[in-house]
Swiss-Prot record:
Superkingdom, natural source: Eukaryota
Upper lineage: Eukaryota, Amoebozoa, Evosea, Eumycetozoa, Dictyostelia
Domain description: The three subunits of the retrotranslocation channel (PEX2, PEX10 and PEX12) coassemble in the membrane into a channel with an open 10 Angstrom pore. The RING-type zinc-fingers that catalyze PEX5 receptor ubiquitination are positioned above the pore on the cytosolic side of the complex.
Catalytic reaction equation(s): S-ubiquitinyl-[E2 ubiquitin-conjugating enzyme]-L-cysteine + [acceptor protein]-L-lysine = [E2 ubiquitin-conjugating enzyme]-L-cysteine + N(6)-ubiquitinyl-[acceptor protein]-L-lysine
GO biological process, one term: protein import into peroxisome matrix
UniProt membrane topology term: Multi-pass membrane protein
Biased composition annotated in UniProt, kind: Polar residues: 1-11, 18-31
Intervals, Peroxisomal matrix compartment: 1-82, 136-165, 217-243
Cited Gene3D superfamilies: Zinc/RING finger domain, C3HC4 (zinc finger) (3.30.40.10)
SMART domains: RING
Protein name: Peroxisome biogenesis factor 10
């Protein structure tokens, strides 16, 4: 019976399920272990990848930020001004300085009289330029030309605003030094006639300096080169600026040609002197010839002064021209408004239109007054 029961129990389905359930659960657990390990490894790998990516992203972002910072820093430093803007600024300043010089000259003429101020035109010009300089550069502001072109003076290589000693130095080299040199050169040439060659060297040196400016655009004037002051832009310049290299090259060619012609003429003159000295044979006669040459140079300087006086007379003749015929006035006639014309010109004008040609004041032939011994 027991055997039968055991057999029956063994073949009973519920018993089989109960007996197999523990083994089945353990098998399921064992079978489920490898997948969990694989999933954990995959998760760990994914976490490591995320960490690596998160570590790389800040580095890339930092590099991009550094590049942007470098670009921004490069934009913080303004660029140097170019030749066209510097020339335009200088021309604008010269225009306003000329107007101011004329006004100062008229004011001084009324105060001191025309005879006194005509002999001191250079001093009146220096006074006007000094006032213009004190009202602009000396107080640290821009000149009218610099404002027009958005330029600013700075110390080269430091990008700092010029200090008061730098401005005083610029004023001395720009205004006082040329005035003192111009006043002292005639006396220097009288004492040392051999230094007369400086009068021809200085203009060539100035043209050479101008050629260098056309090449590199650094210093337009000697005063700014000696005081180490340059111009920068107040605005951002995106477009390319034109260059004046061709003008600099042409100036250098002109300087070389003029120097060659000058040396050629002097060498020919020296050869003639040597030949004349060989024929004479005495050293004392050579010294006399040299003294004669020095006297000739002094006479040339006197002739040059006379030529300057003639030029001044020509300017006065230009002021005495009639505004209608543009020639020197003949039989000078004054109108009621005070303008001067030729008698023939103003009478013909009054026959057509009874108005002054200059100010349109009503006039007639009866009111025109001829000026005798004028």
């Amino acid at each position: 019976m027991s055997n039968v029961q055991s057999q029956s129990n063994s073949h009973h389905p519920v018993h089989n399920i109960v007996n197999r359930s523990p083994t089945s659960r353990s098998e399921q657990q064992i079978r489920s272990i490898p997948p969990t390990n694989n999933n954990n490894n995959n998760n760990n790998n994914s976490i490591n990848n995320i960490n690596n990516n998160t570590q790389r992203q800040p580095l890339n972002n930092n590099n991009n930020n550094n590049n942007n910072i470098n670009r921004n820093n490069s934009n913080l430093y303004p660029s140097y001004a170019d030749q066209p803007d510097i020339l335009r600024s200088s021309q604008k300043d010269e225009y306003y300085k000329k107007l101011f010089e004329d006004q100062c000259f008229e004011m001084l003429t009324r105060i001191t009289g025309p005879r006194f101020i005509m002999n001191r035109q250079s001093e009146s010009k220096l006074l006007a330029n000094t006032i213009y300089y004190l009202l602009t550069t000396m107080i640290g502001s821009q000149t009218l030309g610099e404002e027009y072109c958005n330029l600013r003076k700075i110390k080269d290589k430091t990008f700092s605003i010029p200090s008061i000693p730098d401005r005083i130095k610029l004023y001395f080299f720009h205004l006082l030094a040329p005035y003192l040199i111009k006043k002292s050169l005639p006396k220097l040439f009288q004492r040392h006639p051999k230094l007369y060659i400086l009068k021809e060297i200085f203009p060539k040196f100035e043209r050479l300096h101008l050629a260098l400016f056309y090449f590199n655009g650094s210093y337009f004037e000697f005063s700014k080169r000696l005081s180490d002051i340059r111009y920068i832009f107040n605005r951002k310049i995106d477009q390319k600026r034109p260059k004046y290299d061709i003008l600099g090259l042409l100036i250098i060619i002109q300087i070389l040609l003029s120097t060659f012609m000058y040396l050629k003429e002097n060498s020919f003159f020296l050869k003639q002197q040597q030949k004349d000295g060989g024929c004479n044979g005495d050293g004392e006669e050579d010294n006399q010839d040299l003294n004669k040459d020095i006297k000739i140079e002094q006479v040339d300087s006197v002739i040059n002064n006379n030529n300057q006086d003639q030029n001044n007379n020509q300017e006065e003749e230009e002021e005495q021209k009639c505004t209608l015929c543009l020639e020197v006035r003949t039989h000078t006639t004054a109108t009621i408004c005070g303008h001067l014309f030729c008698w023939h010109c103003i009478t013909e004008w009054c026959n057509n239109k009874e108005q002054c040609p200059v100010c349109r004041c009503p006039i007639s032939i009866r009111t025109c007054v001829p000026l005798y011994n004028y």
